[in-house]
Protein backbone atom coordinates (compact mmCIF):
# COMPACT_ATOMS: atom_id res chain seq x y z
CA UNK A 1 0.00 0.00 0.00
CA UNK A 2 1.23 3.48 -0.86
CA UNK A 3 2.04 5.50 2.29
CA UNK A 4 -0.39 8.24 3.30
CA UNK A 5 1.38 11.59 3.68
CA UNK A 6 0.64 15.18 4.58
CA UNK A 7 0.62 15.85 0.84
CA UNK A 8 -2.19 13.28 0.51
CA UNK A 9 -4.35 15.34 2.86
CA UNK A 10 -3.43 18.59 1.13
CA UNK A 11 -4.63 17.03 -2.13
CA UNK A 12 -7.91 16.06 -0.45
CA UNK A 13 -8.44 19.68 0.59
CA UNK A 14 -7.66 20.99 -2.88
CA UNK A 15 -10.08 18.51 -4.43
CA UNK A 16 -12.70 19.10 -1.70
CA UNK A 17 -12.69 15.44 -0.70
CA UNK A 18 -13.50 14.92 2.97
CA UNK A 19 -11.34 12.45 4.87
CA UNK A 20 -11.77 10.49 8.10
CA UNK A 21 -9.20 10.02 10.86
CA UNK A 22 -9.34 8.26 14.22
CA UNK A 23 -7.34 7.66 17.39
CA UNK A 24 -5.60 4.38 18.15
CA UNK A 25 -3.36 3.23 20.96
CA UNK A 26 -2.37 -0.35 20.11
CA UNK A 27 -1.28 -2.67 17.31
CA UNK A 28 -4.55 -4.55 16.80
CA UNK A 29 -6.84 -1.56 16.35
CA UNK A 30 -4.26 0.29 14.27
CA UNK A 31 -4.06 -2.70 11.92
CA UNK A 32 -7.85 -2.98 11.73
CA UNK A 33 -8.19 0.73 10.90
CA UNK A 34 -5.45 0.57 8.27
CA UNK A 35 -7.00 -2.55 6.73
CA UNK A 36 -10.30 -0.67 6.36
CA UNK A 37 -8.70 2.40 4.80
CA UNK A 38 -8.42 4.69 7.83
CA UNK A 39 -4.84 5.66 7.16
CA UNK A 40 -4.53 8.79 9.30
CA UNK A 41 -4.26 7.88 12.97
CA UNK A 42 -3.68 9.99 16.08
CA UNK A 43 -1.93 8.54 19.09
CA UNK A 44 -3.70 10.95 21.39
CA UNK A 45 -3.11 11.91 24.98
CA UNK A 46 -6.78 10.94 25.26
CA UNK A 47 -5.22 7.59 26.20
CA UNK A 48 -4.96 9.04 29.69
CA UNK A 49 -8.73 8.74 29.97
CA UNK A 50 -9.60 5.89 27.61
CA UNK A 51 -6.69 3.54 28.37
CA UNK A 52 -5.30 4.60 31.75
CA UNK A 53 -8.57 5.59 33.43
CA UNK A 54 -7.66 9.13 34.51
CA UNK A 55 -10.25 11.91 34.55
CA UNK A 56 -8.18 14.14 32.24
CA UNK A 57 -5.25 13.98 29.82
CA UNK A 58 -2.89 15.77 32.21
CA UNK A 59 -1.11 12.72 33.74
CA UNK A 60 0.05 11.39 30.34
CA UNK A 61 3.81 11.44 29.76
CA UNK A 62 6.01 11.56 26.68
CA UNK A 63 7.08 8.01 27.49
CA UNK A 64 3.42 6.92 27.40
CA UNK A 65 2.91 8.50 23.98
CA UNK A 66 6.13 6.98 22.62
CA UNK A 67 5.18 3.50 23.88
CA UNK A 68 1.76 3.57 22.23
CA UNK A 69 3.13 5.17 19.05
CA UNK A 70 5.53 2.27 18.62
CA UNK A 71 2.66 -0.21 18.87
CA UNK A 72 0.42 1.74 16.49
CA UNK A 73 3.20 2.07 13.94
CA UNK A 74 3.57 -1.70 13.81
CA UNK A 75 -0.13 -2.01 13.04
CA UNK A 76 -0.23 0.77 10.45
CA UNK A 77 3.17 0.75 8.73
CA UNK A 78 1.99 2.94 5.85
CA UNK A 79 -0.29 5.24 7.82
CA UNK A 80 0.19 8.91 8.59
CA UNK A 81 0.70 8.87 12.36
CA UNK A 82 0.16 11.95 14.49
CA UNK A 83 1.29 11.88 18.10
CA UNK A 84 0.30 14.29 20.84
CA UNK A 85 2.93 16.08 22.86
CA UNK A 86 1.30 15.85 26.30
CA UNK A 87 0.82 18.43 29.04
CA UNK A 88 4.00 20.40 29.87
CA UNK A 89 6.01 18.62 27.16
CA UNK A 90 6.47 21.79 25.09
CA UNK A 91 6.78 24.62 27.61
CA UNK A 92 9.79 25.90 25.65
CA UNK A 93 10.77 25.40 21.99
CA UNK A 94 13.83 23.45 23.09
CA UNK A 95 11.79 21.11 25.28
CA UNK A 96 9.31 20.64 22.45
CA UNK A 97 12.07 19.65 20.05
CA UNK A 98 13.59 17.15 22.46
CA UNK A 99 10.23 15.51 23.18
CA UNK A 100 9.16 15.60 19.53
CA UNK A 101 12.34 13.75 18.63
CA UNK A 102 11.38 11.02 21.11
CA UNK A 103 7.94 10.41 19.60
CA UNK A 104 9.25 10.73 16.03
CA UNK A 105 11.82 8.03 16.76
CA UNK A 106 8.94 5.91 18.09
CA UNK A 107 7.24 6.11 14.70
CA UNK A 108 5.24 9.34 14.51
CA UNK A 109 5.19 11.36 11.28
CA UNK A 110 3.95 14.52 12.96
CA UNK A 111 3.41 15.95 16.43
CA UNK A 112 0.26 17.71 17.64
CA UNK A 113 0.40 20.56 20.13
CA UNK A 114 -2.39 22.55 21.75
CA UNK A 115 -2.43 26.34 21.80
CA UNK A 116 -2.47 29.55 19.80
CA UNK A 117 -0.12 32.41 18.98
CA UNK A 118 2.09 31.74 22.00
CA UNK A 119 3.30 28.61 20.18
CA UNK A 120 4.54 30.41 17.07
CA UNK A 121 8.24 30.22 17.97
CA UNK A 122 7.87 26.56 18.95
CA UNK A 123 6.19 25.70 15.65
CA UNK A 124 8.89 27.55 13.73
CA UNK A 125 11.66 25.75 15.57
CA UNK A 126 10.12 22.33 15.02
CA UNK A 127 9.39 22.81 11.33
CA UNK A 128 12.85 24.24 10.68
CA UNK A 129 14.24 21.04 12.18
CA UNK A 130 12.12 18.70 10.03
CA UNK A 131 9.42 17.98 12.63
CA UNK A 132 5.97 18.43 11.02
CA UNK A 133 3.43 20.08 13.32
CA UNK A 134 -0.34 19.78 13.68
CA UNK A 135 -1.92 22.60 15.68
CA UNK A 136 -4.95 22.17 17.94
CA UNK A 137 -7.37 25.02 18.72
CA UNK A 138 -10.78 25.46 20.31
CA UNK A 139 -11.38 23.12 23.22
CA UNK A 140 -7.85 22.08 24.09
CA UNK A 141 -8.19 19.36 26.76
CA UNK A 142 -4.82 20.12 28.38
CA UNK A 143 -6.32 23.51 29.35
CA UNK A 144 -9.35 21.98 31.08
CA UNK A 145 -8.50 23.68 34.37
CA UNK A 146 -8.41 27.09 32.68
CA UNK A 147 -11.68 26.51 30.82
CA UNK A 148 -13.41 25.16 33.92
CA UNK A 149 -14.46 22.00 32.12
CA UNK A 150 -15.01 20.70 28.61
CA UNK A 151 -16.92 23.59 27.03
CA UNK A 152 -17.55 24.91 23.52
CA UNK A 153 -15.01 27.58 22.57
CA UNK A 154 -15.08 30.48 20.10
CA UNK A 155 -18.58 31.80 20.70
CA UNK A 156 -18.97 35.55 20.26
CA UNK A 157 -17.13 37.89 17.90
CA UNK A 158 -14.08 38.47 20.09
CA UNK A 159 -13.48 34.80 20.84
CA UNK A 160 -14.05 33.71 17.24
CA UNK A 161 -11.75 36.40 15.85
CA UNK A 162 -9.05 35.35 18.31
CA UNK A 163 -9.26 31.70 17.23
CA UNK A 164 -9.10 32.69 13.56
CA UNK A 165 -6.05 34.83 14.32
CA UNK A 166 -4.45 31.92 16.18
CA UNK A 167 -5.10 29.57 13.26
CA UNK A 168 -3.54 31.95 10.75
CA UNK A 169 -0.54 32.48 13.02
CA UNK A 170 0.08 28.74 13.39
CA UNK A 171 -0.16 28.25 9.63
CA UNK A 172 2.24 31.13 8.99
CA UNK A 173 4.69 29.61 11.48
CA UNK A 174 4.73 26.36 9.52
CA UNK A 175 1.98 24.13 10.93
CA UNK A 176 0.81 21.70 8.25
CA UNK A 177 -2.45 20.52 9.83
CA UNK A 178 -4.93 21.94 12.33
CA UNK A 179 -7.41 20.21 14.63
CA UNK A 180 -10.45 22.29 15.63
CA UNK A 181 -12.34 20.96 18.63
CA UNK A 182 -15.77 21.96 19.94
CA UNK A 183 -16.31 25.23 18.11
CA UNK A 184 -19.42 26.60 16.38
CA UNK A 185 -19.93 25.40 12.81
CA UNK A 186 -19.88 28.98 11.56
CA UNK A 187 -16.41 29.57 13.01
CA UNK A 188 -15.13 26.22 11.75
CA UNK A 189 -16.21 27.22 8.24
CA UNK A 190 -14.43 30.58 8.49
CA UNK A 191 -11.20 28.98 9.64
CA UNK A 192 -11.31 26.10 7.15
CA UNK A 193 -11.84 28.50 4.25
CA UNK A 194 -9.17 30.93 5.48
CA UNK A 195 -6.40 28.34 5.78
CA UNK A 196 -4.42 26.67 3.02
CA UNK A 197 -3.58 23.72 5.28
CA UNK A 198 -6.15 20.96 5.95
CA UNK A 199 -8.40 21.39 8.99
CA UNK A 200 -9.64 18.34 10.94
CA UNK A 201 -12.74 18.82 13.05
CA UNK A 202 -14.10 17.16 16.16
CA UNK A 203 -17.29 18.78 17.36
CA UNK A 204 -16.88 21.41 14.63
CA UNK A 205 -19.63 20.36 12.20
CA UNK A 206 -19.19 18.86 8.75
CA UNK A 207 -17.59 21.94 7.21
CA UNK A 208 -13.96 21.03 7.93
CA UNK A 209 -11.71 19.14 5.51
CA UNK A 210 -11.55 16.05 7.71
CA UNK A 211 -12.99 14.56 10.89
CA UNK A 212 -11.52 12.76 13.86
CA UNK A 213 -13.11 10.75 16.65
CA UNK A 214 -11.68 9.07 19.70
CA UNK A 215 -12.11 5.40 18.81
CA UNK A 216 -13.90 4.64 22.08
CA UNK A 217 -16.54 7.26 21.23
CA UNK A 218 -16.96 5.88 17.70
CA UNK A 219 -17.69 2.41 19.10
CA UNK A 220 -19.70 3.40 22.16
CA UNK A 221 -17.29 1.94 24.69
CA UNK A 222 -16.66 5.12 26.63
CA UNK A 223 -18.01 5.14 30.17
CA UNK A 224 -19.76 8.16 31.61
CA UNK A 225 -20.50 11.33 29.65
CA UNK A 226 -20.93 10.93 25.89
CA UNK A 227 -19.91 14.04 23.92
CA UNK A 228 -22.62 15.64 21.78
CA UNK A 229 -20.46 15.24 18.68
CA UNK A 230 -19.94 11.48 19.16
CA UNK A 231 -21.81 8.79 17.26
CA UNK A 232 -21.84 5.09 18.10
CA UNK A 233 -21.26 3.45 14.73
CA UNK A 234 -20.97 0.00 16.29
CA UNK A 235 -24.54 0.15 17.60
CA UNK A 236 -25.84 0.55 14.06
CA UNK A 237 -23.72 -2.16 12.47
CA UNK A 238 -23.04 -4.76 15.17
CA UNK A 239 -19.65 -5.44 13.61
CA UNK A 240 -16.52 -3.47 14.32
CA UNK A 241 -15.14 -3.57 10.77
CA UNK A 242 -18.51 -2.55 9.38
CA UNK A 243 -18.59 0.28 11.95
CA UNK A 244 -15.22 1.56 10.73
CA UNK A 245 -16.40 1.42 7.12
CA UNK A 246 -19.61 3.27 7.99
CA UNK A 247 -17.74 5.98 9.90
CA UNK A 248 -15.39 6.49 6.96
CA UNK A 249 -18.23 6.54 4.42
CA UNK A 250 -20.38 8.97 6.42
CA UNK A 251 -17.49 11.39 6.87
CA UNK A 252 -16.54 11.27 3.21
CA UNK A 253 -20.15 11.84 2.12
CA UNK A 254 -20.76 14.63 4.66
CA UNK A 255 -23.53 12.72 6.46
CA UNK A 256 -21.51 12.69 9.68
CA UNK A 257 -21.33 14.84 11.66
CA UNK A 258 -24.96 15.89 11.33
CA UNK A 259 -26.76 18.86 12.83
CA UNK A 260 -27.39 16.88 16.02
CA UNK A 261 -23.61 16.56 16.52
CA UNK A 262 -22.85 20.25 15.91
CA UNK A 263 -22.62 23.49 17.89
CA UNK A 264 -23.70 27.04 17.01
From Swiss-Prot:
Localization (cell): Cytoplasm
Pathway, per record: Cofactor biosynthesis; (R)-pantothenate biosynthesis; (R)-pantoate from 3-methyl-2-oxobutanoate: step 1/2
GO BP terms in the entry: pantothenate biosynthetic process
Active site positions: 181 (proton acceptor)
Residues reported to bind 3-methyl-2-oxobutanoate: 45-46, 84, 112
Keyword annotations: Cytoplasm, Magnesium, Metal-binding, Pantothenate biosynthesis, Transferase
Necessary cofactors: Mg(2+)
PANTHER family in the record: 3-METHYL-2-OXOBUTANOATE HYDROXYMETHYLTRANSFERASE (PTHR20881:SF0)
Family: Belongs to the PanB family.
Reported function: Catalyzes the reversible reaction in which hydroxymethyl group from 5,10-methylenetetrahydrofolate is transferred onto alpha-ketoisovalerate to form ketopantoate.
UniProt protein name: 3-methyl-2-oxobutanoate hydroxymethyltransferase
Organism the protein comes from: Shigella dysenteriae serotype 1 (strain Sd197)
Amino acid sequence: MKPTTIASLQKCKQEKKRFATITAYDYSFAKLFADEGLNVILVGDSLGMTVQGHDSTLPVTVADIAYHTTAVRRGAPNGLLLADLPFMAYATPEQAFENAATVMRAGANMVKIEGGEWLVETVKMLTERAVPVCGHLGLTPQSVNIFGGYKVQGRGDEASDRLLSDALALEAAGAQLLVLECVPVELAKRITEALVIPVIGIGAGNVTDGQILVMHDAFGITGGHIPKFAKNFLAETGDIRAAVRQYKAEVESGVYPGEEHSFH
